[in-house]
Amino acid sequence: MSIVTKSIVNADAEARYLSPGELDRIKSFVLSGQRRLRIAQILTDNRERIVKQGGQQLFQKRPDVVSPGGNAYGEEMTATCLRDLDYYLRLVTYGIVAGDVTPIEEIGLVGVKEMYNSLGTPISGVAVGVKCMKSVACSLLAGEDSAEAGFYFDYTLGAMQ
């Protein structure tokens, strides 16, 4: 839940106006909006590069994934793996834009471990792929922007533990 929604819900539950502290937090959130949008735009503009290089790093670190019998063996399964990585990158951009993990959690992480287990896909391999994408994505950003994006990648990774 965004800081705006959370503040309004809390104030309304107490039948009061927003406090000066809540208004300050909302102001900070709004002022950080341009930065969050810029970060999301950079990641979106570079999504093919991030997914491709992240996938290449995954396959170097985990060659078993693309070896015969691996979950990403063959062209079709490799494409499926890269599609999944792209999905997690998209979720990260949603979180960045919202300034909150709720979209990541509600759209894409509920039942993620169970889903991959039911498919016979080790979640650890998916997590390595997301970690590799984090490395590529954060290399495109500087300082606070990199830390901001890193937070949402880390949140996604935490749900895969």
Swiss-Prot record:
Keyword Transcription regulation attached: no
Annotated positions of the N4-methylasparagine modification: N71
A Pfam match: Phycobilisome
Topology within the bilayer: Peripheral membrane protein
First-listed, main subcellular location of the protein, grouped into a coarse class: plastid
Compartmental location: Plastid, Chloroplast thylakoid membrane
Post-translational modification: Contains one covalently linked phycocyanobilin chromophore.
Listed GO biological process terms: photosynthesis
Database matches in Gene3D superfamilies: Phycocyanins (1.10.490.20)
CDD domains: APC_alpha (cd12125)
GO-annotated cellular components: chloroplast thylakoid membrane; phycobilisome
Keywords: Antenna complex, Bile pigment, Chloroplast, Chromophore, Electron transport, Membrane, Methylation, Photosynthesis, Phycobilisome, Plastid, Thylakoid, Transport
Binding annotation for (2R,3E)-phycocyanobilin: C81
PANTHER family: ALLOPHYCOCYANIN ALPHA CHAIN, PHYCOBILISOME 32.1 KDA LINKER POLYPEPTIDE, PHYCOCYANIN-ASSOCIATED, ROD 2-RELATED
Record's function text: Light-harvesting photosynthetic bile pigment-protein from the phycobiliprotein complex. Allophycocyanin has a maximum absorption at approximately 650 nanometers.
Assigned protein family: Belongs to the phycobiliprotein family.
Quaternary structure annotation from Swiss-Prot or TrEMBL: Heterodimer of an alpha and a beta chain.
Name of the featured protein: Allophycocyanin alpha chain
